């Protein structure tokens, strides 16, 4: 495999195991098939950023890492030190967390999402302009060219999620995705009164932007959400920023 993130083949094998564990963690804890998206960004200095968003609970990046830390240590896999948990960064092979390049860019993206999510569009940003390189999309994003071809994550014969890994061209520093989903079991929610079909359908636009090495922004915009049907959602607060350090 290409040395995308500046790590060795051994690191990539360990990475695959970490991805497998994180997938199992994600879907062991899924709730009624809600819209859930996990994004793993692999930087050129070997660090890994993990972001999770779902439509029912807003999971903070630090809380996400603590949960993954507990799960992976239970599996006797790579553990996370306190610095990595607090800074929301994972360094492979116990690398020195203080030694990274300030100009590091994401070189590969892993997207893991629940069965209720459909990836609609992919956009990439070069510098400050947004463009869609058709030839690259056809090569690396088969659902854009030939239909849905993700890796299926199954348990007891049932599809519990999808996973897709792709590499980013060196000249691109940002990626934007539009996703949508519908709850598998909308009747499980206590809506209290009659609602039209739009009250049980949720569409989300997920935008993941890498502004620089220290800052990534994940924006989740919800459409067609009834406050009565979804009282737990703060529909007035759509944008979230995840600071990787004090630098911006």
UniProtKB/Swiss-Prot annotation:
One of its GO terms (cellular component) is viral occlusion body. InterPro entries: Cypo_polyhedrin_Cypovirus1. Glycans are attached at residues 28, 77, 86, 237. Keywords: Glycoprotein, Late protein, Viral occlusion body. The keyword Transport does not apply. Major component of the virus occlusion bodies, which are large proteinaceous structures (polyhedra), that protect the virus from the outside environment for extended periods until they are ingested by insect larvae. Forms crystal-like bodies by self-assembly. This is Polyhedrin. The gene is S10.
């Amino acid at each position: 495999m290409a040395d995308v993130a500046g790590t060795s083949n051994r690191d990539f094998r360990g990475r695959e195991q970490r991805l497998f564990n994180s997938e199992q963690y994600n879907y062991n804890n899924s709730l009624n098939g809600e819209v859930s998206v996990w994004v793993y960004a692999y930087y050129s200095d070997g660090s890994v950023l993990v972001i999770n968003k779902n439509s029912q609970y807003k999971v903070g990046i630090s809380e996400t890492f603590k949960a993954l830390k507990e799960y992976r240590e239970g599996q006797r896999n790579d553990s996370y030190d306190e610095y990595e948990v607090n800074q929301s960064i994972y360094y492979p092979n116990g690398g020195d967390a203080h030694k990274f390049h300030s100009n590091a860019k994401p070189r590969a993206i892993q997207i893991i999402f629940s069965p209720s999510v459909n990836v609609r569009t992919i956009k990439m940003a070069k510098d400050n302009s947004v463009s869609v390189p058709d030839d690259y999309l056809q090569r690396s994003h088969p659902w854009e060219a030939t239909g849905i071809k993700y890796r299926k994550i199954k348990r007891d014969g049932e599809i519990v999620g999808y996973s897709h890994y792709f590499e980013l061209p060196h000249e691109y520093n940002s990626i934007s995705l539009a996703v949508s989903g519908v709850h598998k079991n909308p009747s499980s929610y206590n809506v209290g009164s009659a609602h039209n079909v739009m009250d049980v359908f949720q569409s989300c636009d997920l935008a993941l932007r890498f502004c620089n090495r220290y800052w990534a922004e994940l924006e989740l915009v919800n459409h067609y959400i009834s406050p009565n049907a979804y009282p737990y959602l703060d529909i007035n607060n759509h944008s979230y920023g995840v600071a990787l350090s004090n630098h911006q």
